[in-house]
Amino acid sequence: MNANERVIIVGAGHAGATVAMQLRKMDFAGDIILLGDERFSPYQRPPLSKAYLAGEEDAESLKLWPDEIYESKGIMLVQSATVAALDRAGKYVRLADKTEVSYDCLVIATGSRPREIALPGIHLAGVHRLHTIEDADGLKAAIGPGKRVALVGGGYIGLEVAASVVGLGGSAVVIEQQDRVLAGVASVPLSDYLRRAHEDRGVEFLTGVQVARIEGSKGRVTGIRLGDDRLVPCDAAVVCVGVVPNTGLAVAAGLDGANGIVVDHDARTADPAIFAIGDVTCRPMPLYDDRMFCLRSVPNALEQAKQAAAAMMGKPRPKPEVPWFWSHQFDLKVQIAGVPFDADDLVLRGDPAAGAFSAFHMKDGRVLAVETVDAPLEFAAGKQMILRKSVLSREQLVDPRVEVTALAV
């Protein structure tokens, strides 16, 4: 790309802001327009359910870069900008105010949004979702000493919010329709461990139950009515039942994006002038025989931002990175690396009953993924095993006399 060309980035989250910075780092001298639909400059979302909600961080500390950096690097950051349409033939985007902006390359980094559920009472005051700073501010004002909060959904966000609520002196009850928390995203040992850790700190759990409706009085939530007619009283409720990718813009323009915009190893879509990065994508996984997968994590957003910038600038493709994810709950640090595609063996190292432990997901002796709790060495070693496609025996992994770092070489 040359100095006469323009890159438009739709979405000013972690992925969008990072690709803008990467382009400047690679000496792209053309126009960069970063369009964000929030009134805030790009910020970190993961702390919203943890440190920010708990009052340990403020909005300023969440910013990815100081506001003045965008101007100094010649990045035009446009806030509160909604992109209404994409014209691939004309190579321009149309904003909600009818403004049309042309591009030479377009990056779609529209992220994801909370999944909607149709429940009577869902629009009552005191029923929250958690996706933006404004969402977190609204929830923060509703929790505190003596307040009881119901979490509809037992995924990572639900557990993180429950931990923050208890940390602020409130009480929390997690309502999950599956028979365990983190079903589908964590192993049974990790799921059971985190549930016990929460219960030890006073969090209640109702699993294997359905929510019939949200009840209220004078327009404000008062409880969650279950399918078996039990009532779970609460002062506030948080609906956290997963996310869906914001593919509407791409799909309307004819790109493949049923469950995520399909991209290649360079984060390029079927249109050679359009890239997509972050939560909105479905991408090949080079460490897993290019299996297509929808990854929704900050490390994935950063990796794809680097891929897209390199491709636009004609630079070599960055080396594949091991996908990973983290969660903080109370004083526990959960770290996960890899994806357990087709894993048929789970090997525990350490004892969950004693505290720190790790769980290795394997197939035919190959380490595909690792889950750890307060086990940074095992996490780091596990990442290397995944990267190197290490083949190990169960005996090697479970033997505490064998240094885990020695297994990663």
Swiss-Prot record:
MF GO annotations: oxidoreductase activity, acting on NAD(P)H
Cofactor: FAD
EC numbers: 1.-.-.-
Signals that turn on the gene: By the monoterpene alpha-phellandrene, but not by acetate.
Signal peptide: none
Key words of the record: FAD, Flavoprotein, Oxidoreductase
Enzyme class: oxidoreductase
A GO CC annotation given for this chain: cytoplasm
SUPFAM superfamilies: FAD/NAD(P)-binding domain, FAD/NAD-linked reductases, dimerisation (C-terminal) domain
InterPro entries on file: FAD-oxidoreductase/Apoptosis, FAD/NAD-bd_sf, FAD/NAD-binding_dom, FAD/NAD-linked_Rdtase_dimer_sf, Reductase_C
Pathway info: Terpene metabolism; monoterpene degradation
UniProt binding sites for FAD: A15, D37, K50, V83, D279, V298
Family of this protein: Belongs to the FAD-dependent oxidoreductase family.
Function: Involved in the degradation of the cyclic monoterpene limonene. Probably part of an electron transfer system involved in the oxidation of limonene to perillyl alcohol.
Protein name: Probable ferredoxin reductase CtmF
Native species: Castellaniella defragrans (strain DSM 12143 / CCUG 39792 / 65Phen) (Alcaligenes defragrans)
